[in-house]
Amino acid sequence: MTVKTTLNAKDVDNAYLRIKDVVKETPLQFDLYLSQKYDCNVYLKREDLQWVRSFKLRGAYNAISVLTSEAKEKGITCASAGNHAQGVAYTAKALNLKAVIFMPVTTPLQKVNQVKFFGSKNVKIILTGDTFDDCLKEALIYTEQNHMTFIDPFNNVDTIAGQGTLAKEILNQSSNDSITFDYLFAAIGGGGLISGISTYMNQYSPQTKIIGVEPSGASSMYESVVVQNKIVTLDHIDKFVDGASVARVGDITYDIAKKFVDDYIQVDEGAVCSTILDMYSKQAIVAEPAGALSVSALEQYKEKIKGKTVVCVVSGGNNDINRMKEIEERSLLYEEMKHYFILNFPQRPGALKEFVNDVLGPQDDITKFEYLKKTSQNTGTVIIGIQLKNHDDLNQLKINVHDFDPSNIYINENKMLYSLLI
């Protein structure tokens, strides 16, 4: 069988006809807060409100629905630790197909349970491998041995066409109010979303500049398209933005992105965390890290988008509540508002009071203090966390800490030590 490797806008239109009665048409919302913040018109495409709280359902449903009757009868497989697995599970139940979903053993129980919920009795989950790559190998072996069909999360034309239906919806919704977009921002992981969107927008809204956004710790598309001019596999990726942390983009998505994506932005993971918290507190939007990427990118484009009309794809909202402490910590670290030190503390009455009076500013707050008194020693080791009210107070804080203990260790600059705290 010949595998199709090219995509055009007609493929997206056909995909839309297949999925429109199953996939939710998510809102395209004007965002007053972001519009005022950046002095432009910002719209959000709310894929976090999709049935599975992510755009991945679009591609999964389209890719599975075009399979032959024989392939559907034999069943489908996928490997995923997140949103793609939920999209495949939802589709398997909707089409009454057998699906075997492989997930790493390290997958949070919440995500495993969500896949079970969406797939119900149609889905079998196999937890295997410590990493996604190990899990993928097992899935491919199982697929071949059982003559099933593997549903690729991004490097498949039918998957990409399904993701592209999001762009068709944006244009349909905006045309009602005669809105045209100058910029569209969307996250890049493996490249399926940006490829589908850019293909469709190039045909029907060529004036719209397509901006791909990646986490700075996993910018595989930027490295491939812009830096190396060939597909590369990153040696190491930061997996915090798990929905967009891919070491190697797809062959198909690489070719499409190279043709149609106008620019690439890399966003620090700490900035993503600040955006997640901002979206929740200011707009009551629960975005996962990958879902917040597009909005995070606006800060780097703030001069270019002034007076323009912009749309950001909020690609997903599957955020594990157990991660919120880490998200807050990463945000405070990025904003330079929270700082950790290891100090030698005098073991005598009144030492802590002296520290508070001599080191802390009037608005500084101690958020962590770990200390075990040892009567046989003159000093004891203390781990202390200090949160600032004003980021400009940092230099004075460091001076005061140094005066108190010249041998202090500033933990924020030591990734290994800092990782023990969160």
UniProtKB/Swiss-Prot annotation:
The keyword Zinc does not apply. The modification N6-(pyridoxal phosphate)lysine is found at K56. It comes from the Bacteria. The keyword Signal does not apply. Pfam families: PALP, Thr_dehydrat_C. It is an enzyme of class 4 (lyase). Pathway: Amino-acid biosynthesis; L-isoleucine biosynthesis; 2-oxobutanoate from L-threonine: step 1/1. Its EC number is 4.3.1.19. SUPFAM superfamilies: Tryptophan synthase beta subunit-like PLP-dependent enzymes. PROSITE patterns: ACT_LIKE, DEHYDRATASE_SER_THR. Residues 339-413 form the ACT-like domain. Keywords: Amino-acid biosynthesis, Branched-chain amino acid biosynthesis, Isoleucine biosynthesis, Lyase, Pyridoxal phosphate. Its cofactor is pyridoxal 5'-phosphate. It catalyses: L-threonine = 2-oxobutanoate + NH4(+). Pyridoxal 5'-phosphate binds at N83, G189, G190, G191, G192, L193, S315. One of its GO terms (molecular function) is threonine deaminase activity. One of its GO terms (biological process) is threonine metabolic process. Belongs to the serine/threonine dehydratase family. Homotetramer. Catalyzes the anaerobic formation of alpha-ketobutyrate and ammonia from threonine in a two-step reaction. The first step involved a dehydration of threonine and a production of enamine intermediates (aminocrotonate), which tautomerizes to its imine form (iminobutyrate). Both intermediates are unstable and short-lived. The second step is the nonenzymatic hydrolysis of the enamine/imine intermediates to form 2-ketobutyrate and free ammonia. In the low water environment of the cell, the second step is accelerated by RidA. This is L-threonine dehydratase biosynthetic IlvA. It comes from Staphylococcus haemolyticus (strain JCSC1435). The gene is ilvA.
